[in-house]
Amino acid sequence: MTIWNAILLGLVQGIAEFLPISSSGHLSILQNLFHMSTAEDGHLFFDVLLHLGTLVSICIVYWRDIVAMVRETFAFFGNTRLPAEQRRKQFPAARMVLMIVLATLPLFLILPINDKVEQLYYHTFFIGLMLILTGCLLFVADKMPKGTRTEKNMRVRDALIIGACQAVATIPGLSRSGTTIAAGMATGLERSFAVRFSFLMSLSAVLGANILALAKAAKTGIDVSLLPAYLVGMLVAMASGIVAIGLVKRLTSKGHFGAFSYYCWGAGAVTMLLSLIF
C-alpha cells in the first residue's frame, strides 16, 4: 500500500460514498480490473479508516442536525408530562431519530446472507449491471413530482421503505445514497430532506459495519508501518466526502439529481465491457 494508492482509494471512497454512484462498486472495480490493494488484500483496517473518514464528513456537514437530534431526544423523554402527540410536534428532530432507527431495522435482515452478498464484489460484470440499474433509479426519481414531507410529518411507512432500499443497496454496484434518496423522493419526501435523511441515516449503518469490520481487523492484525498511508487515505476520504455532500445537496435542490444517471450508465457500460476483455 503506497501513499498514492491510499490517496486514490480515499478519493474514490469520499466521492463515491456520497455521490449516488456506488463507492463499493468503484472500489471493487479498482481491485478487480486494476489489482489495487483493498480490504480483501489484508488492508481491512484501512477500509475501516476510509469509512471513518466519510463518517466524520457527515458529522462536520450536519453537526447542527446531530446536536439537535441529541438535545431534542433527551428533551422528548424528559417532558413526559406533555402528551406524546404534542412532544412529537414540539421536538421534530427527536422524531427523526425514531425514523432513522426504524429505517435501520431492515439491515438486520441482510446479516444472515452477508457473506453471500460479499462474494458479488468479485463479479465485475454484475457490478457494471448494477451501476446501470442505479442510473435508471436516479433518472426515474428525478422525474417524479416534488414531495413536501419532512421530519415533522414523515410517515413510519416512508422510513421502512427507505430502510428496505438501504438493505438492498448492500449489493455492490447499487448506490446506497442514490437508492435511499430516490426512495425518499418516491415516498413524497421534500428533496433536500430526502438527501439529509439519507446521509444522517447512514451514520448508524456505517458505524455498525465499522464495528464489525474492526473486530475482523483486530483478528487479522494491523501493519503499523502502513499507518501513515492509511491516515492520509482517511483524511482524503473525509475532505472529498465533505465536497461530495455539498455537491449532492446543491444539484438536488436545483432539480439536477438525475444528472448522475448518465455517469452511472457510462461507468456501468464501460465496466461490463472491460470485464469481458480482461
Model-derived segments and their meaning:
Residues 1-278:
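Multi-pass membrane proteins that catalyze or facilitate reactions on polyprenyl-/lipid-phosphate substrates
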